Amino acid sequence: MALVPYEETTEFGLQKFHKPLKTFSFANHTIQIRQDWRHLGVAAVVWDAAIVLSTYLEMGAVELRGRSAVELGAGTGLVGIVAALLALKSSMKPLLVHCLLFFSGAHVTITDRKVALEFLKSNVQANLPPHIQPKTVVKELTWGQNLGSFSPGEFDLILGADIIYLEETFTDLLQTLEHLCSNHSVILLACRIRYERDNNFLAMLERQFTVRKVHYDPEKDVHIYEAQKRNQKEDL
């Protein structure tokens, strides 16, 4: 689940989370994301980090050829949906080098805890064309639990938006990242640095991965960090 605190106490902040529908434009598609703050809380609203990470992917900052991606703590599923749409768009233009490329055989897996899955599935099904839905899987994943349902090193790209907040989840999240990553995998984490514990997680991450900040959105105060296993080459 997208584990972030609700900090916006102004009336304006409340209004944006209580809107039942938010509309975005990515990958030449109009995406309509349902929200349900009242019943599902933080897992069912679109956080700024998800918007910034989706924009970063659309910028073509990551190049993938015939590889697979997974979103952790997907919540509403915006990032995973955008990744899947970019996969479709890019597969239509295989000669376009500087964009996010997913070819046949690639797939996107969008994950969250069981309590959020039905809501997540509804957003994914509503926003992905039927012919690419078979390439997109919504799957339960509670960090640190039942990792055997995923093959070790299964994914080339691991995505997370505002998933580093609760300290009690840090060890499980690191264990999950370690399991899902191979030596060539790339992790992209988008987050706000709200508290010292957020920096503590990054320090923990650096013990197992090479970490660097690759993007900052000053308007939304969101950082994007890229991480790769330390025993791999610097370049993907």
From Swiss-Prot:
Function, as annotated: Protein-lysine methyltransferase that selectively trimethylates residues in heat shock protein 70 (HSP70) family members. Contributes to the in vivo trimethylation of Lys residues in HSPA1 and HSPA8. In vitro methylates 'Lys-561' in HSPA1, 'Lys-564' in HSPA2, 'Lys-585' in HSPA5, 'Lys-563' in HSPA6 and 'Lys-561' in HSPA8.
Subcellular localization(s) per the UniProt record: Cytoplasm
InterPro entries for this protein: Methyltransf_16, SAM-dependent_MTases_sf
Official protein name in the record: Protein N-lysine methyltransferase METTL21A
Gene this protein is translated from: METTL21A
Subunit (UniProt): Interacts with heat shock 70 family members; at least some of these proteins are methylation substrates.
GO cellular component, one term: cytosol
The EC number(s) this enzyme carries: 2.1.1.-
SUPFAM superfamilies (UniProt xref): S-adenosyl-L-methionine-dependent methyltransferases
Keywords on record: Cytoplasm, Methyltransferase, S-adenosyl-L-methionine, Transferase
Similarity comment: Belongs to the methyltransferase superfamily. METTL21 family.
Class of this enzyme: transferase
GO terms, molecular function: ATPase binding; Hsp70 protein binding; protein-lysine N-methyltransferase activity
Binding residue positions for S-adenosyl-L-methionine: W47, G73, A74, G75, D112, W143, A161
Short name of one Pfam family: Methyltransf_16
Listed GO biological process terms: protein methylation
Catalytic activity: L-lysyl-[protein] + 3 S-adenosyl-L-methionine = N(6),N(6),N(6)-trimethyl-L-lysyl-[protein] + 3 S-adenosyl-L-homocysteine + 3 H(+)
Phylogenetic lineage: Eukaryota, Metazoa, Chordata, Craniata, Vertebrata
Top-level taxon of origin: Eukaryota
